[in-house]
Structure formats: C-alpha cells, structure tokens
Design a protein with these regions (language model features):
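Generic structural signal of hydrophobic/aromatic residues within well-ordered alpha-helices
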Residues: 28, 68, 86, 106, ...
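C-terminal motif of bacterial Sec signal peptides marking the signal peptidase cleavage site
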Residues: 11-14
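Bacterial N-terminal signal peptides that target proteins for export
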Residues: 1-2
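N-terminal Sec/ER secretory leader and immediately downstream segment
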Residues: 18-167
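Extended, low-hydrophobicity segments enriched in charged/polar residues
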Residues: 123-228, 232
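A cross-kingdom marker for long, charged
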Residues: 18-41, 203-335
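Acidic-enriched, low-complexity/disordered segments with a strong bias for Aspartate over Glutamate
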Residues: 16, 23, 65, 70, ...
Length: 335
C-alpha cells in the first residue's frame, strides 16, 4: 500500500474533474462532522496495489531459431518466411501484441508444413507443441505487458466520472468480448485480424477503465468504512434534534448523490469485471505479482478490493438502518 503522491493530492484540492467524486464524498463527511456528536474526517488517500513493472508481468517464451540449411529447406512452406520475420531486425524488438500474432502464425505454419527430414520434422513438432502450451502466456503478454495495459490499469487517472453510465462503455465491452473469444479459442489457433486486435488494445488504453474503477472502489470503501466506524458509537442519546440533523445530511449527501453513483458503478463493474477476470484466467499462468494484482478485481475472492467494497457498502447501510431504527425514524434510499 502506497500513500498517493502530490500529483493526486493537488488534483483533489483543485478543479480537476477526475477527482470530482472526492469532493462529493468529503462533503458527506463534512456535513456529518458539523454535529457536535461525531468527529469524522476524510480518510487518508492510500493506493491499492498498482500494475507490476514490465519485468514482473512479462512471461518468458521459447525462442525459435533455425540454421541456414534448415531455413533453406523450409522455404517450400511458410515456416521459413514466418521465422524469418521474427529473426529480422524489427522482429527482434516486436511488441508483445505482435509477438502473440507471430506465435499463432509459426505454430500454424509448422503444423501445416510437409517436412521431408524426419529429424527436422520431429524438432519442429516439439517446438510447435511447446509453443501451444505457451500460447496463454503469449496472449497474456499481449494484453498486460504493453503501453495499453499501463494506461488501462493506471491509478493516476482518478475516479470514474460522477455521471458515468453503462452506455459509455459499449465500445469497451465489445473489445473485451472479442479478446475473450480469442483467448477462449487458443487451442484452435484462431485467425486474428491484426488491425482489429491492436484496435481493441487501443480501446482498453483509451478507456482507462480498470485503474479508474480500482481507484474509485478503494476511495468509496475508505469513506464508507470511516462513516460506519464513526456512527457505530452513537446510541439513543442522539435521538431527537441531533438525529434529525444526521438524517438530513444522510439524505442530502448519501441518498441523493453517493448512493446513485455507487449504483452506476456497480452496474458498470458487473458488466466489465466478469470479462476482465476471464482474460486473467485465459492468460494463466500469470506471474506471482500479476496474480496478486489481478486478485483485486475478483468478484468472489473474500480479500479482493471488490469484495471489501461490497462489505463496506452493506455495513454502511446496516449501521445507518440500525441507528434510524433505534430512534424510530424511517428514511428512504437504503437497500
């Protein structure tokens, strides 16, 4: 866990719309804090785990090198051509997205080539088998080891917008669905349109969705837990005018602003996270660092950021309901 630096803090205190939600949340706690019965401050900004560095998320793949004589004997089929593409100057520095497409091409070329030399045929057959086993890792490298993933998972872009809705993520959903189809058919060596594949990675990058969601639910959790802990100590002595004030603040800040925003975030995440988690699974085995990072998005793991956010939301609702019930007051908006 890392305390967020000066850039984010400056954004929160300024007019940066990426942190508009922070103002809404701090107004909620500030409103409660004006009562003499509680002291609740905005929680410190503490970051969730960030995307691991490239060397901690890239999986090593088997290199395929052929000698000159073998290369000449393979010119009768596509193996020599495809292998030559990888061994070129540009091929040696190809990005992971292109390396994934190359892996598909070289396996397809080897398995379709009629090789006269039994020794060479056995060698290439072994290489193709090994590369088939590594395809999920090549796929994961393409998804999670480029500049696109760094933007997609970046925590420096703030919250999902206050007015965010599922209507704004259709392009992202389409891209994720296409990527899942590819990952789910690796054993069949899918024919992948390079321009569409690269375009889908660009869509992920431009959306900045995963990092924004992770930052959003982390801050929501912090605020909800802070409020829940504060009102947990209140008893019937605050019933009457003080409780009337709390009800007013709760309804004007939480029911009218925070809760609807959380509802939009939940609907959005329940569309995206199943696909994102599927992509993590289709890219297995991930590095230890990537497994730890990806676990934050799990819909089911008890220690995920998502589950902690859900528990914070439920406890917040339960605590307010208990307090209103204690003072025989009814209130709208809880679910």
């Amino acid at each position: 866990m890392i305390l967020l630096g000066g850039i984010i803090l400056a954004g929160v205190s300024g007019c940066d719309t990426r942190f508009q939600v922070e103002d809404v949340l701090s107004q909620y706690t500030a409103g409660l804090n004006r009562s003499q019965f509680v002291s609740v401050s905005s929680p410190a900004i503490v970051m969730p785990a960030s995307l691991p560095s490239s060397r901690h998320r890239q999986q090593s793949l088997t290199q395929f090198d052929i000698g000159l004589l073998d290369y000449l004997s393979l010119q009768q089929c596509n193996v020599g051509v495809v292998a030559g593409r990888k061994n070129s100057i540009l091929g040696k520095v190809m990005p992971d997205s292109q390396r994934f497409l190359y892996e598909l091409d070289i396996i397809r070329a080897i398995e379709s080539c009629d090789i006269q030399s039994d020794t060479l045929a056995d060698e290439l057959r072994h290489i193709a088998q090994q590369k088939r086993l590594e395809l999920p890792m090549a796929f994961g490298n393409a998804l999670f080891n480029g500049a696109e993933s760094e933007a997609f998972f970046s925590l420096s872009n703030g919250f999902l917008p206050l007015n965010y809705s599922t209507a704004q993520q259709q392009e992202l959903m389409n891209a994720l669905n296409r990527l899942v189809v590819i990952g789910d058919s690796l054993d069949r060596l899918p024919i992948v349109d390079a321009s569409v594949f690269e375009g889908d990675l660009k869509i992920l990058m431009d959306s900045e969705y995963a990092g924004r969601l992770l930052y959003t639910i982390t801050r929501l959790t912090d605020y909800l837990e802070r409020v829940t802990h504060t009102i947990d100590g209140l008893d019937q002595s605050i019933c009457g005018a003080p409780m009337g004030y709390f009800k007013q603040q709760y309804e004007s800040h939480y029911v009218e602003s925070v809760q609807p925003y959380m509802g939009r975030i939940n609907r959005s995440a329940y569309q995206v996270l199943p696909l994102l988690n599927t992509l993590f699974e289709l890219s297995a085995p991930l590095s230890n660092e990537m497994r730890f990072f990806s676990q934050q998005f799990s819909l089911t793991a008890a220690d995920s950021r998502w589950q902690r956010y859900q528990r914070a939301s439920q406890e917040h609702a339960r605590q307010w309901s208990t307090l209103f019930g204690r003072c025989a007051m009814s209130v709208g908006g809880e679910s």
